[in-house]
């Protein structure tokens, strides 16, 4: 008898491009399922941006509280920190408790913690409730992304993961507008928006099917299931992807965070103009995600281009003589970011089997939001060394260019290594 096949890694996305999805990918049921997953993935974005427009009013309300200058901004940022720290643990719970069950529970609890500032009068208690919002966001984001990996395969999976990026970019702009409009009636009013998750939870319970491991591998050989069942968690390959994701998230978020300060340094102080620039850059993220979905290139092939575009955008911002050129640089950067995010996510997903998917996506999600949390700290550190925020963009341009070159070299090396043919077992 021939020797048993060695453990097979999860196939890259292009290798299973023609494989059937685990779930039906047409009809009203498919569209409803996809809508629920995209809506769920937008809930953490709601937590990140909704209250930004009312922070000044919130500061005025708690002006008598010691430490208000630190606590009020923390109410905005602490959910992201909680998400970064707890998403890996949420991934472990996802694999053990079940994706659908945890998603439904987390979506309900999200509404309870999210609306808590409506009746809390202590600023410290509000910040604590915001931290708990981040805990539920970690579970929701991990569950939604993992379910996309469970329900779909190949390029369909890649397309819907990229769609997640598009929905996040669009929803961020929409939530800012909602928060600003609702905030005109009082700083507490925007927190009512968190109750929308109570509408999503019963729909998720009714219309999201219970995921199950796909059985494509069973067709390979009767010996494969036993071997794959003992397959260890892919720590080493996933660690490299997660480290690259932390760095990529810093490149992705820096200009979104620093844009208003850079424009202010050039004399642009009108909030309408700053908002217009932010909306244009958000549109570039959507365009980048669309570009990713419209081609058949693998994530490994896209990453050098994505990091190169981010680096080029930073370089233009660094050398920009006026706000228009600065905005063009930010658009180039965000175009690269729109390609980068789905590339990194699909790359991580391709390394994971069903049993490991929750834990792996939790690690990836934590890495991404850790990079988001670190980006302003990185800019502060670089600015203290090079003397200005604009010059720090030049340092990031150089680092992005180095990463792009290294990824391009790695892609060429992989392309030069022909895969060994798999010997078929005669029946």
Regions found by a protein language model. Name each.
Residues 74-91, 279-291:
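Central cavity-lining transmembrane alpha-helices of secondary-active solute carriers
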């Amino acid at each position: 008898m021939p020797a048993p096949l060695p453990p097979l890694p999860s196939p890259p996305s292009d290798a299973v491009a023609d494989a059937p999805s685990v779930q039906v990918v047409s009809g009203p049921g498919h569209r409803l399922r996809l809508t629920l997953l995209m809506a769920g993935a937008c809930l953490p974005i709601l937590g990140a941006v909704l209250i930004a427009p009312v922070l000044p009013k919130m500061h005025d309300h708690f002006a008598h509280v010691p430490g208000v200058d630190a606590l009020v901004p923390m109410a905005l940022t602490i959910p992201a920190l909680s998400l970064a720290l707890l998403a890996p643990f949420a991934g472990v719970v996802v694999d053990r408790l079940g994706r659908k069950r945890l998603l439904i529970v987390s979506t309900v609890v999200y509404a309870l913690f999210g609306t808590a500032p409506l009746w809390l009068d202590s600023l410290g208690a509000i910040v604590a409730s915001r931290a708990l919002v981040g805990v539920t966001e970690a579970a929701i984001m991990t569950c939604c992304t993992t379910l996309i990996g469970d329900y779909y395969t190949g390029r369909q999976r890649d397309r819907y993961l990229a769609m997640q990026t598009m929905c996040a970019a669009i929803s961020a702009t929409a939530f800012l507008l909602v928060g600003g409009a609702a905030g005109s009636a009082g700083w507490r009013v925007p927190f009512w928006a968190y109750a929308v998750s109570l509408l999503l939870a019963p729909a998720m319970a009714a219309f999201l099917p219970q995921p199950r491991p796909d059985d494509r591998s069973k067709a390979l050989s009767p010996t494969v299931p036993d071997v794959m069942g003992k397959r260890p968690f892919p720590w080493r390959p996933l660690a490299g992807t997660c480290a690259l994701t932390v760095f990529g998230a810093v490149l992705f978020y820096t200009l979104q965070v620093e844009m208003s300060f850079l424009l202010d340094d050039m004399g642009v102080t009108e909030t309408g103009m700053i908002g217009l620039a932010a909306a244009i850059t958000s549109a570039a993220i959507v365009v980048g995600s669309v570009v990713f979905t419209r081609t058949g290139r693998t994530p490994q092939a896209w990453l050098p281009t994505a990091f190169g575009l981010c680096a080029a955008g930073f370089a233009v911002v660094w050398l920009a003589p006026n706000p228009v050129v600065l905005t063009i640089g930010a658009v180039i950067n965000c175009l690269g970011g729109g390609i980068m995010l789905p590339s990194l996510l699909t790359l991580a997903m391709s390394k994971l089997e069903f049993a490991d998917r929750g834990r792996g996506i939790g690690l990836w999600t934590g890495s991404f939001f850790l990079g988001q949390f670190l980006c302003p700290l990185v800019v502060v550190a670089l600015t203290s060394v090079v003397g200005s925020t604009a010059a720090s963009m030049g340092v990031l341009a150089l680092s992005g260019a180095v990463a792009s070159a290294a990824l391009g070299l790695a892609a060429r090396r992989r392309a030069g290594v022909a895969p060994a043919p798999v010997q078929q077992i005669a029946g």
